[in-house]
Amino acid sequence: MDKFVIQGGVKLEGEVRISGAKNAALPLLAAMILADTPITLKNVPDLKDVRTLVKLIGGLGITMSYEGETVIANTSTLDNQFAPYELVKTMRASILVLGPLLARYGSAKVSLPGGCAIGSRPVDQHLKALEALGAQIEVEAGYVHAKVDGRLKGGEVIFDMVTVGGTENILTAAVLAEGVTTIRNAAREPEITDLALMLIKMGAKIEGLDTDTLVVTGVESLHGCEYSVVADRIETGSYLAAAAITGGKVKTTHTDPNLLESVLDKFEEMGAEVTRGEDWIELDMLGKRPKAVSFRTLPHPEFPTDMQAQIMAVNAIGRGFATISETIFENRFMHVPELARMGANIQVEGNDAVVTGVEKLSAAPVMATDLRASFSLVLAALAAEGETIIDRIYHIDRGYEDIEAKLQGLGAQIKRVSE
């Protein structure tokens, strides 16, 4: 099993190119199933989850080409609608093939998903929404069996809670449904807008982008197109956090500052100088120790839960104290005991964490528990005195492309070692 060995205490400086967003690439890949002519997706990040989903879609009989940052799919060769447990178990996003398969082919058998162990994250919202469009669904022996007689029928979908995956699944189903579908309490994440934009390019009719009410007028078929995955706002924020925690200066390129306003505001509150361009962001901590900042995670456009762990790590060496409230997922403070091993002073009570900044963190052996938590440990290690070893880094490979090379390019002393 691979580990990271990180020698801390180096100010990070330089430029880093941001990859396409994993959280956009996965629903976009699933939506390729809807195209009745070849479809090309560019700026695709080379990540384990992406490779798994490409393999899963290929397992449906679809001809997949994956070279560099480009995936091409030809659905004319599809010969089954079965997504097996062996592939689905490692990744929650595999449930996203359910909507497209059901909408285009009238049936699907998809294993219940796996992925990061953060809270329950149930798929019941997905299934309830598809039933509202006329799907007949049974869950048996760990599999979702879905079918529809003829086409799905447009209807009103009201989510009980904001669900990104649920919104994506119903959106990719509704585009081929008969009539009009209204999706209320829809998630507003940029990755959903990205999905809607590709679907529109394929011939879909969708209104209400960037709002919590999407109106979809179904069409009979969708064609292929060429589309590029939106920049990864979480990777962007993560590398800016690396500049903040080390007192350095980092410029992120090929990104979109408009997708990260709530996080950039917090960096400025820390005392960082943040400069924005059309497709770049630069953070200069001016060699200072950041001020600890309080925040509450909420659905977009508020502070994203996927940046909670990284900003907590910066707060750990901040001036003063801060309160962090996690309102999206339960059980998302699993990085706290590991940060504490490095000397962080963090008290957790329920869904709140109070971080009292310390001047220095110390190197220690630590263990990654989930995707974003693992980057928070990398950040802590970059700022700590001495050599930190981070175990179970397969979590980080699920969401960060080429992380060692990117950090090394900023001056970090990081290497991957295999046992």
From Swiss-Prot:
A Pfam family matched in the record: EPSP_synthase
Residues spanning the membrane: none
Reaction catalysed by this enzyme: phosphoenolpyruvate + UDP-N-acetyl-alpha-D-glucosamine = UDP-N-acetyl-3-O-(1-carboxyvinyl)-alpha-D-glucosamine + phosphate
EC number: 2.5.1.7
Major localization class: cytoplasm
Pathway stated in the Swiss-Prot or TrEMBL entry: Cell wall biogenesis; peptidoglycan biosynthesis
Binding of UDP-N-acetyl-alpha-D-glucosamine, residues: R92, R121, P122, V123, D124, Q125, D306, I328
Positions bearing 2-(S-cysteinyl)pyruvic acid O-phosphothioketal: C116
Signal peptide (UniProt feature, chain positions): none
Gene Ontology terms: biological process: cell division; cell wall organization; peptidoglycan biosynthetic process; regulation of cell shape; UDP-N-acetylgalactosamine biosynthetic process
Annotated compartments: Cytoplasm
Active site: residue positions: C116 (proton donor)
Source superkingdom: Bacteria
Family the entry assigns: Belongs to the EPSP synthase family. MurA subfamily.
Function: Cell wall formation. Adds enolpyruvyl to UDP-N-acetylglucosamine. Target for the antibiotic phosphomycin.
PANTHER family: UDP-N-ACETYLGLUCOSAMINE 1-CARBOXYVINYLTRANSFERASE
Protein name as catalogued: UDP-N-acetylglucosamine 1-carboxyvinyltransferase
Species, as recorded: Acinetobacter guillouiae
Gene name of the encoded protein: murA
